A protein has these predicted regions:
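N-terminal "arm"/small-domain region of PLP-dependent enzymes with the aminotransferase-like
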Residues: 1-56, 147
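Phosphate-binding glycine-rich loop
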Residues: 63-103, 121, 300
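PLP-dependent aspartate aminotransferase-fold enzymes
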Residues: 79, 95-133
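Active-site phosphate-binding strand-loop segment of PLP-dependent enzymes
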Residues: 126, 130-188
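PLP-dependent aminotransferase class I/II
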Residues: 203-280, 284-287
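Conserved PLP-binding catalytic core of the aspartate aminotransferase-like
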Residues: 269, 281-313
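PLP-dependent enzyme catalytic core of the Aspartate aminotransferase-like
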Residues: 309-313, 318, 322-351
Length: 351
């Protein structure tokens, strides 16, 4: 059959999302979801919701959420755009700033969706390599990315969990003559963030998601903060009603319960560090994680074998093929009971 697709789409491999298994009694630690439920405020908001409202369209701009996010970032509503998950906002940015004549630069390894979005635009991807052992960032990163129109920094990085020092991020923003997109999907698990750089530099976009620290991966909600001119341009690219009514309502309820969210984050960070120390004691190589997961190389350096062993024992983690990433598995931090089971299995195999 004749193909009606653009050549870029025909050649596209597509993004491989983390497996969402239907198997009962499987410990699922492969997609960096929060092990704890959303705030009770979400259930209360759903109980009080008037279902008759669903016959109406939602606020196309999610202005109530924009005001809440703006207040937290100490900016104005005009500095904020809300999306159907941060992937929606990433898609807008790639549509806005990349093309066959406008390359994008990404650090390698990082989020595997970026090259897919670039390919959809027919854009070249300039890969700036991280150190292959500790996954540290090069001081000349902006120079390596100089031909690009957009530089993407995942902070903390996925899948490694490492953190580009804020002073180095600031240096990149100052030296790079293009858009600097800082993807802070895991930012709440780190010691600091880059939201204030939006006011320091006109070329910076900082992006957040509700899928990790907010326990709402199933809702699909995210937001980005930048200067008003960039936000105005991105507004032209969004779907007309890109954030549904229920997402806006439960997103607000959940986000405002900051005390509960902070307790969940603290528990995850504590368990992350405990599991990291325990695995290193039996020979795992783990770069310091600032996220809600560990990037862990087993003592024999065979990440795929370790992944399969855990899967055979009803624990699902993530494995990424590759010369560097293939040595590792990525383990989402789960409940204390789930983490204990992971440690029990890995102790049995490697200790």
């Amino acid at each position: 059959m004749k193909s009606y697709f653009r050549p870029e789409i025909d050649a596209l491999a597509g993004y491989t999302a983390g497996e969402q298994p239907k198997i009962a009694n499987l410990i699922k630690l492969n997609t960096n979801e929060n092990p704890y439920p959303p705030s009770q405020a979400v259930q209360d908001a759903l109980r009080s919701f008037d279902i008759d409202r669903l016959r109406r369209y939602p606020d196309p701009f999610a202005d109530e959420l924009r005001d809440i996010f703006a207040a937290d970032a100490n900016v104005k509503r005009e500095n904020v755009i809300v999306g159907n998950g941060s992937d929606d906002l990433l898609t807008m940015c790639f549509r806005a700033f990349t093309s066959p004549d406008h390359p994008v630069a990404v650090f390698e390894p990082s989020y595997s969706l970026y090259p897919v979005l670039a390919a959809m635009q027919g854009a070249e991807v300039i890969k700036v390599k991280l150190d292959s052992c500790k996954f540290t960032y090069p001081a000349d990163g902006a120079q390596q990315a100089a031909r690009a129109n957009m530089l993407v920094i995942t902070r903390p990085n996925a899948p490694t969990g490492t953190l580009c020092p804020k002073d180095l991020v600031r240096q990149y923003c100052r030296e790079f003559d293009g858009i600097v997109l800082i993807d802070e999907a895991y930012g709440d698990f780190a010691a600091d963030n880059c939201m204030d750089l939006v006011k320091e530099f006109d070329n910076v976009i900082v992006m957040r998601t509700f899928s990790k620290s907010c326990s709402m991966a199933g809702v699909r909600l995210g937001y980005a903060v930048s200067n008003p001119i960039i936000i105005e341009g991105l507004m032209k690219l969004k779907d007309s009603y890109n954030v549904d009514m229920l997402s806006q309502i439960v997103g607000k309820a959940n986000y405002l319960d900051k005390e509960y969210r902070a307790k969940c984050i603290d528990a995850i960070k504590r368990d992350r560090d405990d599991l990291s120390n325990a695995l290193q004691n039996i020979g795992f190589e783990i770069p310091e994680s600032h996220a809600n997961f560990l990037f862990a190389a087993p003592p024999d350096g065979d990440g795929e074998s370790c992944f399969r062993y855990l899967r055979e024992n009803a624990v699902l983690v993530r494995y990424f093929k590759g010369d560097i990433t293939g040595r590792y598995i990525r383990i989402t931090i789960g409940t204390p009971e789930e983490n204990a089971r992971v440690l029990e299995l890995l102790n049995a195999r490697y200790a």
